[in-house]
Amino acid sequence: MTILTHTLGFPRVGLRRELKKAQESYWAGNTTREALLAVGRELRARHWEQQKQAGIDLLPVGDFAWYDHVLTTSLLLGNVPARHQNNDGSVDIDTLFRIGRGRAPTGEPAAAAEMTKWFNTNYHYIVPEFSKGQQFRLTWTQLLEEVDEALALGHKIKPVLLGPVTYLWLGKVKGEPFDRLTLLKDILPVYQHVLAELAKRGIEWVQIDEPALVLELPQAWLDAFKPAYDALAGQVKLLLTTYFEGVTPNLDTIIALPVQGLHVDLIHGKDDVAELHQRLPVDWLLSAGLINGRNVWRADLTEKYAQINAIVGKRALWVASSCSLLHSPIDLSVETRLDTEVKSWFAFALQKCGELALLRDALNSGETAALEEWSAPIQARRHSRRVHNAAVEKRLAAITAQDSQRENPYEVRAEAQRARFKLPAWPTTTIGSFPQTTEIRGLRLDFKKGNLDANHYRTGIAEHIKQAIIEQERLGLDVLVHGEAERNDMVEYFGEHLDGFVFTQNGWVQSYGSRCVKPPVVIGDISRPAPITVEWAKYAQSLTDKPVKGMLTGPVTILCWSFPREDVTRETIAKQIALALRDEVADLEAAGIGIIQIDEPALREGLPLRRSDWDAYLEWGVEAFRINAAVAKDETQIHTHMCYCEFNDIMDSIAALDADVITIETSRSDMELLESFEAFDYPNEIGPGVYDIHSPNVPSVEWIEALLKKAAQRIPAQRLWVNPDCGLKTRGWPETRAALANMVKAAHNLRQAK
């Protein structure tokens, strides 16, 4: 039985972010739809060929998406909210963009659908909306068209589909409440139709993703898998695909299904290969996810060989990435600025394909010399001076409970803060960043490339900060920000100023739609060699009598949005970052900054997928935040910001952060998130986001007032702040001014109505 290689998916955006540029050009009306579609075809063809040349035997098709793969599945099933539909009932790429962005080059603007994190990753998806009695039909044939493309190019392929049960699990009911699982019988005919079309094309295997099977699902949802897969069986071979955790707790459900193979994540799961081999039906193929799809580290292939070799020849076996390589940068070979030592520790998506090929060849032949050669740099890294810092390790070991306690409780601090700031009712602020204009990005790029000296760069940044302060004062905001003109990314910026991180030139990964991020890589112990944000915060405060917030990214978010080390725990990394940023809080306070925001948008996304593992994570995650913040005096107001969160199941931990003010993303969920704070009787101040910054649509004064009145039904008005959902870096100035003017006007109206 020859072992084959495959990947669960590949990065879509292109090495130079070609997809992002094509999307944004199309949205701006600068290119045609045909030109956009052509870029997609070119990228798919290139990526299939690259994977093939790197040694992948079965290429994934259907992993490409114009926004995200869950939204693609919604269109496949004809699940289009009424507000986004074309007048003639047809579905096209602009339909997709209206759902994701709220607008497109054609059709009427409408509120974008809700967006949230994909399991515990930094990738996002558009949440499917379900209504009672909803009808489904095959309306979007992107998958079939891409299968035809790949077959025409002569590739051996494996189409990829998001499974029906996971799709329903990921959605939300809109309108009259009902059990969305009852829609399963209605979407299965569409899946049957698609599988029949794939069978007609001679497809042997289909990868059907059911990552919900790694969760602690309610019994009714577990019970739904058997009838669903009974309905889908028989047309093609199905590779039931799971990732991000192990499957052992749900293995009884899985082995009862009429599928022909199972993919398991052997990186993030704790499944035992021998037990899986023993319990799976003897005729099933096992796809072993041995190469980490979510990081940038070179794999120890000798270890992977030992992990799987015992079952070679005993059942059909494929070797694969643990999950889609979507979460990894594309190609390490184009990184020219990493020094040789550090570069030897890494592997990006194409190199991971090469790792799979090396592993396949060794498992098929029994020859392991190539694996030992590949793995040698990993042994060297374990002893590198660039990894270990004795002073950091000593400080971490000396942390006490007192280091995570503010001097006094919130009630005492709030009095001191009210006396200091004298803010009006319904105080207005923004979350931190202002539009990153072409001029700002050009300024940073010229400085980075050496085309601009430090003095001219600093003069330019200072002018943009000054303009941001002027804009905010003109708008009438109460608490200002400096706008973050000097920051390329909220995590990358801090990583650049902390020891223990390295950066790539082209290590882009998709976050959502056209948004890409270039995560820093934690290669060693973390420390702060010098103040990071103090100079610009102090300058901004000197321009105004209103308070200006100091802006920090929190330790858990820096951890979650970086590629972490694998040789220490996530807790260790988070607390090292917290200690470094604790010094930053102290320095900001000493410089006269009275309000300091520590953003933790990733706190919830870092949760383990199984609820039984949550407590330990939340304990150290909360402690890291408190270590970061607790150095502040009573009269210093600590804010935190979170987005895409459902809080009801972690409210104890949110309260335990003990932030004086929390701002949250609520507009897309119509203030639903505040129910959690109301039920918990959250004691501190809250800024529910009153408009969606991910959409270019400008909210009306009436819309914002209505949301704030709804918020005041749940939270006492004296504890409410008024702010957008998130930072404004991706927006343009015209819509930013208009939206903030309406937001300030709404707050003024509510003050006058008291």
Swiss-Prot record:
Q: Cite the Pfam families for this sequence.
A: Meth_synt_1 (PF08267), Meth_synt_2 (PF01717)
Q: What are the coiled-coil residue ranges?
A: none
Catalytic activity annotation: 5-methyltetrahydropteroyltri-L-glutamate + L-homocysteine = tetrahydropteroyltri-L-glutamate + L-methionine
Name the EC number(s): 2.1.1.14
Question: Is the keyword rRNA processing in the record?
Answer: no
Pathway involvement of the protein, from the record: Amino-acid biosynthesis; L-methionine biosynthesis via de novo pathway; L-methionine from L-homocysteine (MetE route): step 1/1
Gene Ontology BP, a term: methionine biosynthetic process
Q: Which domain of life is it from?
A: Bacteria
Q: What is this protein called?
A: 5-methyltetrahydropteroyltriglutamate--homocysteine methyltransferase
Q: Which organism is the protein's source?
A: Salmonella typhimurium (strain LT2 / SGSC1412 / ATCC 700720)
